[in-house]
Amino acid sequence: MGRFTQGIYGYAFALLVCLAAVGAFLLVTPQSRTEHIPRVDFSIDRVNAARAASYEVLAPGQVLPDWVPNSTSLTEKNGVVTWRLGFATAKRQHAMLAQSDEKPSADFVNRMANTDKPGGSRQIDGATWEERFRQDKNQRSLVRVFPDHAVVVTGTADWDELTALARTLAPQPKPSPVPSSG
């Protein structure tokens, strides 16, 4: 045993033992070859946004085929209601719907679009949306500013996918007030 603990033989033996251990570990470790994108249920945030917001909340009437809703965030701070809803698109890009009654609306829009430079406009179901593009982030944005709030559809998704998301947006009804116990 002495010759396996000294010199080059010891080094080679230790290396062989380590490689055998790594090989055994790789054989018994489960490996998934399928992509897993976590899915979130945004229905509660959709209802709560419609309840809390002073403006008409827009939400997808139906999630597009092969799209996965993967994030939702509803914040209410100092009377400002902001809802963000993120998706992994069918082409595995990112798209997000963001809306808020933050004032001035331009600050919210510029922050969500990561640019303050309009690049054109497009008609989507009779409504005019402003286009913005930030090349260094590969971020496209569609913007609509209403008198009481702003809506931004943005992400790395291409214009067609962002337009498809904008087409699904529908006003959400205000839910009935929650009865208080008392």
Regions found by a protein language model. Name each.
Residues L26, P30, P118-G182:
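A short, solvent-exposed beta-edge/loop patch
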